[in-house]
Amino acid sequence: MPIVPLRGIELYYESHGHRGDPTVLVHGSLTDSSGWARVLPGLARGVSVLTYDRRGYGRSTPGPRPTPVRTDAEDLAALLEATDFYPVHLVGHSYGAAVALRLASERPDLVRSLALHEPPYVGLLADRPATAEFGRTFLAAIDPIAAQVAAGAAAAAARTVVDAFSVRPGAWDRLPEAARRTGAAAMDRWVEEYRDGEALRPDPAGLRETLVPVLLTVGEESPAFLREISALLAADLPNATLRSIPGTGHTPQLSAPDPYVGLLLSFLLERNVPQS
């Protein structure tokens, strides 16, 4: 199984499919690259896919802590260069979307396009009068969740987080047992990620300068705050399209893999470079 040593850590990655443009899937919080399993077969029929575990997740080593979003973006750049797998289409889910957008802003030479599902830029809400109260309330909830994790109640903290990102009650309980174990084990990383101000507030200049095509997707059943964040991004990014996915919420790769794959491939294949 491929492991690449870089920047003092080891990143685990897998390759799927051998046709079409290089495409990298960047997972979010409380999961790892295995969370893409339901969309991989469909995507690999149209594009060449690389999945990987971000540092501190799955089979990748953690390195020094904490890990800000810029470190995740630098890791991804190093992985692309080490595997000679670029320029790429980046598909990012949740926090992974923030990593992907950060890389596109800092290393546009590596990125061909972005497909981002509900990046959790809660700081955007806190910075705008109409949504400031919700944004501040969300940010204020991070410390109590961190206290739960520090007290050894990671599973309870993970339940709070997962349920907050769903409009239907019991989202945590509907997850497979393996996914709940993975989520609880990753709660310390979640705390780091959501305490990183750069991760929750994209640089306005960086948004204006991100010129690659961007597909922003939201779930019709996602909480209003996540849909609002993506709408704000769509207005700020110069070359963005916003699409809604019916019958799903924050995790379309789990709950609506076929519609999600169809939307992604429609976007990606329009931008494929013909093979010589």
Which residues make up each language-model segment?
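Conserved hydrolase catalytic core segment
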Residues: 86-125
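Catalytic active-site module of serine/aspartate enzymes centered on a nucleophile-bearing elbow/loop
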Residues: 238-276
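Helix-rich cap/lid subdomain of alpha/beta-hydrolase
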Residues: 119, 123-178, 194
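Conserved serine/cysteine hydrolase catalytic core
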Residues: 179-235, 244
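Conserved HGGG/HGGXW glycine-rich cap/lid loop of the alpha/beta-hydrolase fold
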Residues: 2-65, 79
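The conserved beta1-alpha1 loop
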Residues: 24-28, 93, 218
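Active-site loop/turn elements of alpha/beta-hydrolase fold enzymes
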Residues: 54, 119, 247
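Active-site loop/oxyanion-hole signature of alpha/beta-hydrolase fold enzymes
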Residues: 38-41, 50-95, 259-265
